[in-house]
Amino acid sequence: MNAFVMHAFRTRRLDVWYGGEAWRPLVHVRDCAYAHIQCIESEPSTVRGKTFNVVQDNYQILDLAQRVKATLGLMDINVEIDVNRDHVDRRSYRTSGDLMKRQLGYSAAVTPEAAVHEIADALRTGVFTNFDHPAYYNLPWMKLLLDIEDRISKTGPIV
């Protein structure tokens, strides 16, 4: 979502590939932090041995693009959506946060619209400026971390 909004903010367009039909679960990092706190503060017997998914909801990519466009539009940032339907994205997946809600009474609350507004505000105020830094993109960031890990294993730690 971060890169999606950053691209829309930067170029005033959103490229939606594969028709945007693929599903993605979304959660804001703040909701993840609260979920971790909830688990830490819970009775150990309530969380021991359990795997909890933290998800606000599941969305199709095209729906997210439309939500980004609408939210940015309310901020006087007009964005066009270009949908490419040439291929099918096989990486479609959904998940459920029902176990966490049942066991701990916790549900993620930050909506995509709230997240878009937060990210756009940060971009407008210059909090983020180097849009091409690998930290903003999952695959380049993971590659960079692996490269650094490899380098440190060969040279040893600095301190």
Describe these PLM feature segments.
Residues 1-16, 26-27, 35:
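Oxidoreductase cofactor-interface core, primarily capturing Rossmann-like NAD(P)-dependent enzymes
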